[in-house]
């Protein structure tokens, strides 16, 4: 419906625009319609020694970003928390098994508490709803943190692609090999992972990894066979089988190129026509992409494939047999109701006949997500990126016997052009041109001063090692633990000091303490409910402030990065902190300095920590708005309710953490935007001009570049803000008006005269 409306709008826009056109505009449109296909073109390349403005901003060193809007992520997070056991595999994947068991216990306790409260609504409702709100909040935040592994569903495009694949794929179902071997390899059955899986693959894929074995017609499992390759991927729990049959050998030809392409075509030809379900369509997609990628490994995609020896037609079957034994499928299965997909499939082919090709290892990987059942578009773009990327331009000889398996994560759609630009920046970053990418830096070994040519990565590595060796404080961890214990015991302490005086506390009995702890007569259901509420508040509040401590530690590390970076051009401080030192006396040094600045600003957790900080910022504003509304309702009775006291404790603790983060962020911004460093280097250049008049022209050039760098940093740098990820301008302005209006009402009610803070520019 929306697409039809857009088409109608475009049609009417062109219709009314035609009445405004003159002859010159019509001629230009005709020229644009012809396009640039007939224009002469010649090869070009990007110069990696030049820099872009993205390098100064830091966007060159891009971080992973979610493809799904934050509104959808919020909805997914709420659903995954409410139906927590149904998404067990997803939670295990993004956390761990032990943490999942702990969270599942908290979830069951929360459900039990809600049921007991509905049966006996005696205790305060805030004691039950508080942990529930914390659980929903942190589940949503965690879903946004791991959202880079969730891909956008392709929707109708994916359905159309599957229908197109069903029309284009054909399979015979009965294909014989050249030797007519009676023991044909019939199926590939996915089994549970064995502990013998290598540590590298265990680290790369995380959780359960499927092991693949070849099953013959007789029911025995084999690893190698000389027969034709008939793999069927069987999924557990009644999932449909996916059959891939080898194509029948066609007419033999003497041309080596045709034989090689025929051998590639035989490996991936045909998928059974009876695959009609949704998962079968997905399997068809993977098989066709694999086949197209294998065929594209020739000269069509830019990868050189050299035929050193003429391949005779009588050797074709033996080549196919050798290649068939080099298949390796690694399938990762998720038991979630919303997640059932392939995680990765990898293919590598090599031969002893002398064929060599660039990028023989072809990879396919899919991350777990509830929406990737319809997402064949992602794999398509991944393969195009893989086959047409710059890494396909090398030519190597593959003579290995075993299979080489390489896995490429494909969680997000990436533009190949963007990858080319990023890799060109990484070329000089990774020492591709030592003459222009290294700087002569001074390092201290004891009391000795030595020079060394260092790159950006080497200098940043030393800085990061110094930051990692820094002993972090535990003050805010202790603050979080104290607030956690106080909030967990707050209902009991509130009833205790409200109903008992200090003299009565000396002679209080255990039964009275239990009654105050439960808030009602200590019957069994009430005692169970009170104990559950205590542990829920204790655990969930501790998790919340633990995340806040992680954010504080990250901001502290960012500040240390900026602090050490600002000391690079200072000889005394560089020696004190044992980091490299160099002056901005050359244009190349200025380039390295700017690159190092952008690189360090992008190191460490970025978006994930910003999610936590933004969520805490919004929570603080929400609590402030609720408190203002309660004060406006009746400021004399505001402190009579326990939940208002609890709101004040939360607001105080959150403000302390936010003030800490704001101060660290502001200091970090000042260190990176310290123009005094560039001004000092300009003074040093003038001092050199006085001592070396023969180099005045060269030093003047460097001085001009420093002036331009100063202006550029002032132009690009923005003031630090805590809100960033979820606080777009619309939400920010609405929140500012609402909160400041509420605060204005409170102040006006307390002071007796009207004041409007929202009209004051912030």
Swiss-Prot record:
InterPro entries reported in the protein's UniProt record: PHTF1/2 (IPR039775), PHTF1/2_N (IPR021980)
Protein name listed in UniProt: Protein PHTF1
Q: How does it assemble?
A: Interacts with FEM1B.
Q: Which residues belong to any copy of the PHTF domain?
A: 6-150
Q: Which residues are glycosylated?
A: 179, 224, 363, 431, 674, 733
* Gene Ontology biological-process annotations: spermatogenesis
Could you confirm whether the keyword Transmembrane helix appears in this record? yes
Biased composition of type Low complexity is found at 348-364
Q: In which tissues is it expressed?
A: Highly expressed in testis.
Main localization is endoplasmic reticulum
Q: Compositional bias (Basic and acidic residues) at which positions?
A: 365-376
Q: Which Pfam families match?
A: PHTF1-2_N
Where in the cell does this protein reside?
Answer: Endoplasmic reticulum membrane; Golgi apparatus, cis-Golgi network membrane
Per the record, residues carrying Phosphoserine are: 272, 276-277, 334, 336
Q: Which residues cross the membrane?
A: 77-97, 99-119, 121-141, 473-493, 515-535, 611-631, 645-665, 737-757
Q: Where is this region: Disordered?
A: 152-184, 345-415
UniProt keyword terms in alphabetical order: Endoplasmic reticulum, Glycoprotein, Golgi apparatus, Membrane, Phosphoprotein, Transmembrane, Transmembrane helix
Q: How does it sit in the membrane?
A: Multi-pass membrane protein
> What gene name is listed for this protein?
Phtf1
Q: Does the keyword Endoplasmic reticulum apply?
A: yes
């Amino acid at each position: 419906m929306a697409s039809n409306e857009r088409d109608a709008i475009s049609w009417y826009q062109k219709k009314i625009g035609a009445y405004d056109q003159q002859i010159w505009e019509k001629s230009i449109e005709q020229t644009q319609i012809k396009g640039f296909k007939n224009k002469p073109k010649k090869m070009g390349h990007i110069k990696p020694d030049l820099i872009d403005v993205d390098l100064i901003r830091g966007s060159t060193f891009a971080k992973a970003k979610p493809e799904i809007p934050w509104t959808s992520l919020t909805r997914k997070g709420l659903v995954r928390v409410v139906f927590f056991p149904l998404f067990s595999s997803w939670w295990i994947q993004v956390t761990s098994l032990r943490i999942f068991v702990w969270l599942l216990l908290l979830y069951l306790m929360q459900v039990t508490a809600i049921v007991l409260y509905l049966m006996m609504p005696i205790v305060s409702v805030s004691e039950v709803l508080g942990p529930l709100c914390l659980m929903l909040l942190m589940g949503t935040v965690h879903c946004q943190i791991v959202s880079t592994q969730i891909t956008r569903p392709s929707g109708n495009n994916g359905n159309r692609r599957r229908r197109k694949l069903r029309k284009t794929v054909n399979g015979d179902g009965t294909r014989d090999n050249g030797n007519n071997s009676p023991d044909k390899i019939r199926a590939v059955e996915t089994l549970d992972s064995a502990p013998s899986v290598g540590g590298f693959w265990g680290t790369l894929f995380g959780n359960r990894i499927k092991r693949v074995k070849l099953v013959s017609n007789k029911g025995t499992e084999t690893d190698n066979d000389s027969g034709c390759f008939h793999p069927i991927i069987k999924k557990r729990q009644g999932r449909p089988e996916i059959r891939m049959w080898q194509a029948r050998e066609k007419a033999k030809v003497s041309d080596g190129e045709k034989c090689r392409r025929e051998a590639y075509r035989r490996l991936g030809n045909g998928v059974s026509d009876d695959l009609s379900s949704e998962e079968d369509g997905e399997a068809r997609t993977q098989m066709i992409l694999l086949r197209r990628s294998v065929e594209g490994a020739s000269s069509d995609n830019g990868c050189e494939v050299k035929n050193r020896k003429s391949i005779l037609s009588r050797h074709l079957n033996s080549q196919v047999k050798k290649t068939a034994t080099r298949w390796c499928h690694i399938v990762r299965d998720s038991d979630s109701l919303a997640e059932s997909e392939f995680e990765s499939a990898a293919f590598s082919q090599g031969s002893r006949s002398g064929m060599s090709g660039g990028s023989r290892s072809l990879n396919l990987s899919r991350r777990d997500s509830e929406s990737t059942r319809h997402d064949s578009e992602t794999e398509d773009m991944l393969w195009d990126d893989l086959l047409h990327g710059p890494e396909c331009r090398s030519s190597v000889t593959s003579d290995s016997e075993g299979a080489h398996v390489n896995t490429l994560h494909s969680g997000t759609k990436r533009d190949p052009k963007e990858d080319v630009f990023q890799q060109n920046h990484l070329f000089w970053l990774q020492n591709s041109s030592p003459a222009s990418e290294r700087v002569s830096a001074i390092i201290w070994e004891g009391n000795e001063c030595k020079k060394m040519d260092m790159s950006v990565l080497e200098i940043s590595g030393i800085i990061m090692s110094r930051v990692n060796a820094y002993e972090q404080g535990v003050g805010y961890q202790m603050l979080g633990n104290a607030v956690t214990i106080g909030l967990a015991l707050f209902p009991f302490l509130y009833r205790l000091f409200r109903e008992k005086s200090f003299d009565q506390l000396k002679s209080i009995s255990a039964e009275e303490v239990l009654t105050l702890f439960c808030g009602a007569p200590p019957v069994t259901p009430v005692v169970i409910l009170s104990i559950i509420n205590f542990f829920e508040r204790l655990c969930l509040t501790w998790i919340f402030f633990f995340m806040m401590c992680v954010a504080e530690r990250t901001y502290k590390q960012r500040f240390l990065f900026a602090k050490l970076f600002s000391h690079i051009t200072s000889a005394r401080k560089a020696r004190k902190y044992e980091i490299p030192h160099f002056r901005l006396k050359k244009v190349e040094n200025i380039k390295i300095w700017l690159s190092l600045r952008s690189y360090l600003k992008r190191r460490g957790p970025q978006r994930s920590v910003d999610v936590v900080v933004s969520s805490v910022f919004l929570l603080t504003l929400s609590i402030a708005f609720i408190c203002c509304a309660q004060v406006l309702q009746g400021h004399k009775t505001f402190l009579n309710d326990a939940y208002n006291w609890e709101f004040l404790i939360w607001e105080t603790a959150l403000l302390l953490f936010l003030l800490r983060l704001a101060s660290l962020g502001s200091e970090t911004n000042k260190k990176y935007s310290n123009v005094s460093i560039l001004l000092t280097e300009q003074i040093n250049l003038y001092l050199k001009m006085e001592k070396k008049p023969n180099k005045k022209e060269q030093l003047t050039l460097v001085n001009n570049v420093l002036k331009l760098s100063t202006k550029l940093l002032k132009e690009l740098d923005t003031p630090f803000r805590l809100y960033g990820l979820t606080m777009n301008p619309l939400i920010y302005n609405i929140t500012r008006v609402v909160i400041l209006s509420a605060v204005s009402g409170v102040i006006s009610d307390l002071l007796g005269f009207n004041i409007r803070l929202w009209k004051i520019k912030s």
